[in-house]
């Protein structure tokens, strides 16, 4: 649970799969850079070994493989569907037993003082 991401994305200019691909590319490069250069990650060598190992078996990766290749892009056609998906996403850490209430998960828009800010629907 703590190693996956759920997003609700809307774009008026580009297909969401293109935006998501760019997001994954950019974040992978930045996170790998922080891991490689950082002194705070104690598991640095192990993590880089795992990313290198998985890159060996993927045809479109050079040195590291960070994100899974499969994306589950689900169109949300109605406001009701959007609200259902938000409720589902907020409840994931509760179902995983990481918190007792959705608002306790600090990496969620359900948190009282979220680090992630949602645009109005």
Language-model segments: residues:
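Short catalytic/metal-binding and nucleic-acid-binding patches
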Residues: 1-121
């Amino acid at each position: 649970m703590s190693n996956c991401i759920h997003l609700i994305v809307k774009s008026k200019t580009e297909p969401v799969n293109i935006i998501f691909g760019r997001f994954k590319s950019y974040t992978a490069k930045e996170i790998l850079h922080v891991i490689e250069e950082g002194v705070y990650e104690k598991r640095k060598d192990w993590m880089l070994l795992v990313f290198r190992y998985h890159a060996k078996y993927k045809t479109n990766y050079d040195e590291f493989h960070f994100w899974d290749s499969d994306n589950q892009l689900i169109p949300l056609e109605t406001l009701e569907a959007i609200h259902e998906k938000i409720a589902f996403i907020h409840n994931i850490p509760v179902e995983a037993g990481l918190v007792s209430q959705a608002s306790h998960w600090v990496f969620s828009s359900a948190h009282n003082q979220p680090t992630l800010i949602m645009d109005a629907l």
